[in-house]
């Protein structure tokens, strides 16, 4: 599910973050190349930007690009996201607009995170203000309720340096390390299905 105005795909990796900075840089480069190859193979226009811990795909086809990037080994998950300046007003406006477009009743929550101290609000305050913005946007049509444990609808916001990313869902990827960064291995495959499945795992 895309937030209104989605213009990018946030790509998350896991195992790569445990590597040294030198090794991680090489793996990030290979991951970007692999994502670019997947996009090209599926005819999806997009520019892949290499960023620490969060590669980005800038595209006019965010859902298709998110699904393609999620097929790359090394990727833990992807999300279609709307970007905006790391300023409270546009973030809160985007939360309200997203709720107006996609919230259809039931409980909701805001999951807000920030990296660094330059943003003027902490994560808890941003979540509280965002919840208020969503409530005011939908209260005339629905009877909203907040449920932080098991909400029916969640708006996620990550604030990183000078940019904020708003997203709704995550597409799971295979995880692991990028294809082409490890030495080849041999898998003994018998006639059944268990062997290739075990080799993949």
Can you say where each PLM-predicted feature lies in the sequence?
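Short glycine/serine/threonine-rich phosphate/pyrophosphate-binding segments
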Residues: 194-199
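RNA-binding accessory domains that recognize and position tRNA/RNA substrates
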Residues: 1-186, 200-201
